[in-house]
Amino acid sequence: MKLVLMGLPGAGKGTQAEQIVEKYNIPHISTGDMFRAAMKNNTELGRKAKSFMDNGDLVPDEVTNGIVRERLSEDDAKDGFLLDGFPRTVEQAQELENILSDLGTELDAVINIDVEKDVLMKRLTGRWICRTCGKTYHEIYNPPKVAGKCDLDGGELYQRDDDKKETVEKRLNVNMKQTKPLLDFYSEKGKLHNINGEQDIKDVFVDVEKILTSF
């Protein structure tokens, strides 16, 4: 089965990806892994990607699409794969269709782990870290016994800038704006399956399996 997995930060996409690839024995192909492999193997596209990244620039679609094409042409992806982090735009989605068409196949499904913004905010802004020992807590899922203090050494808990409300909200807004056209694109193609990501992790995977067993 050929799948694309989508979901905003905090939706639990990584957990579902692990379960899907383990149960269905397909490779988990993430954008980061593809770039790292291409650079490690010193491919022409890998060298191009590295030059852009070293300069702090975004890797252009031409290079990204080429790396995706190379990865999906490998033997382990012939019977299926789980794409994660690609495509990010409608243009990339259209190129993915071209790549798969050239390989004589097509996507089976796009799975979107759907979670409301306010729930994502609670998940993403709840992390606190002990200044002394580095132990991590979460206001909802793993709170300290005494607010603001580490259970182990009584150290002060602090919040990283990345976990602060303003930063998280900005990141989510950018992601939501980028993701909507892509969701619309796959919905019009009849490929999109929205999964309620606010359920228990096990129940989310039950819903994912219902989709995957319908092929």
From Swiss-Prot:
Catalyzes the reversible transfer of the terminal phosphate group between ATP and AMP. Plays an important role in cellular energy homeostasis and in adenine nucleotide metabolism. Gene3D superfamilies: P-loop containing nucleotide triphosphate hydrolases (3.40.50.300). It catalyses: AMP + ATP = 2 ADP. It is an enzyme of class 2 (transferase). It comes from Listeria monocytogenes serotype 4a (strain HCC23). This is Adenylate kinase. Zn(2+) binds at C130, C133, C150, D153. GO terms for cellular component: cytoplasm. Consists of three domains, a large central CORE domain and two small peripheral domains, NMPbind and LID, which undergo movements during catalysis. The LID domain closes over the site of phosphoryl transfer upon ATP binding. Assembling and dissambling the active center during each catalytic cycle provides an effective means to prevent ATP hydrolysis. Some bacteria have evolved a zinc-coordinating structure that stabilizes the LID domain. Its EC number is 2.7.4.3. Belongs to the adenylate kinase family. The gene is adk. Residues 126-163 are annotated as: LID. Keywords: ATP-binding, Cytoplasm, Kinase, Metal-binding, Nucleotide biosynthesis, Nucleotide-binding, Transferase, Zinc. Monomer. One of its GO terms (biological process) is AMP salvage. Residues 30-59 are annotated as: NMP. Pathway: Purine metabolism; AMP biosynthesis via salvage pathway; AMP from ADP: step 1/1. AMP binds at T31, R36, D57, L58, V59, G85, F86, P87, R88, Q92, R160, R171. It comes from the Bacteria. GO terms for molecular function: adenylate kinase activity; ATP binding; zinc ion binding. It is found in: Cytoplasm. SUPFAM superfamilies: P-loop containing nucleoside triphosphate hydrolases. ATP binds at G10, A11, G12, K13, G14, T15, R127, T136, Y137, Q199.
